[in-house]
A protein has these predicted regions:
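Conserved class I S-adenosyl-L-methionine
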Residues: 14, 18-70, 84-85, 104-107, ...
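A short glycine-rich, Lys/Arg-flanked "PGG" loop and its adjoining helix->strand segment in the class I
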Residues: 150-162
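Class I SAM-dependent methyltransferase SAM/SAH-binding core
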Residues: 74-126
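A short acidic, Gly/Pro-enriched loop at the edge of an enzyme's catalytic core
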Residues: 125-136
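Short cysteine-rich clusters marking metal-coordination/redox-active sites
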Residues: 3
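C-terminal lobe and adjacent flexible extensions of AdoMet/dcAdoMet transferase-like proteins
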Residues: 239-246
Length: 246
């Protein structure tokens, strides 16, 4: 498939445009996790968190509600994952989804049905899409651990039309600060719980610990001045929403 944004021809494999088959650093840690047996096991804990917030659809609607309500919207979904919420979007919307995980993209492709959906294997920091092509961009559950979250957000701004909407959501980076054993001076126990009980694995857990102090509101404000930031999911998640400058 030819990409007018960069002038490259990319191969199509199993219905997915392969823009970047090999990744590094944080993105490689994410690939190793989501392509492994750990992800389905961790999904239970994600589901349990959403259950405590009224169910998965109600929880995700706290993010999806900020997308524009317009017909035939062109949506860019960065870190689309398995596309669990695709069925909850209007059927006349077209979606381009990018992710680093082949396993997640394959699951997303199977879920798509008749929706106008194009999938890309690639990184958020280097989106193979044209400038100002989309009406909105969405990213749920990947932003904290992109190789360069600020660069990824600037790429979303580039890809969305002036005046368009960008919606980003994830867990708060310092979520593990809420765990019991950290309060009593035993953070190693909490690390074991996250890695072994919650099934994130050692590499992903190390990454979570490394980025506990990531300044999400600061990144959001630098790239999208005046954007709205709020905590959701009983304080364990966040969403920020902004408009691309005219």
């Amino acid at each position: 498939m030819f990409c007018p944004a960069c002038g490259h021809d990319y191969p199509i494999e199993a219905g997915v445009m392969v823009a970047k088959p090999y990744v590094s650093d944080n993105n490689k840690v994410s690939v190793d996790f989501y392509n492994s047996p750990l992800w389905p096991k961790f999904r239970f804990w994600e589901w349990f968190t959403f259950l405590c917030n009224g169910g998965e659809r109600r929880s995700r609607d706290k993010v999806l509600r900020y997308l524009p309500k317009q017909p035939n919207l062109k949506l860019l979904d960065v870190a689309i994952g398995d596309g669990v919420y695709l069925d909850w979007l209007p059927s006349d919307w077209s979606v381009v989804g990018i992710d680093v995980s082949t396993v997640q993209l394959e699951a997303c492709r199977k879920r798509a049905g008749t929706r106008d959906l194009k999938l890309i294997l690639g990184e958020a920091e280097d989106l193979p899409v044209q400038d100002s092509r989309f009406d909105a961009a969405l990213s749920i559950g990947g932003f904290n651990y992109f190789n360069d979250p600020e660069k990824a957000l600037r790429e979303m701004v580039r890809a969305v039309k002036p005046g368009g909407t960008i919606v980003v959501s994830d867990e708060i980076p310092n979520l593990t600060d809420r765990m019991l054993f950290r309060y009593i001076g035993l953070p190693g126990v909490d690390r074991w719980i996250v890695s072994k009980l919650f099934k994130l694995g050692d590499e992903f857990t190390d990454m979570v610990e490394k980025y506990r102090t990531l300044d999400i509101p600061g990144i959001a404000e630098r790239v999208l001045p005046g954007c709205r930031y709020e905590r959701i999911w009983m304080g364990v998640g966040y969403v920020f929403v902004g408009q691309v400058p005219e």
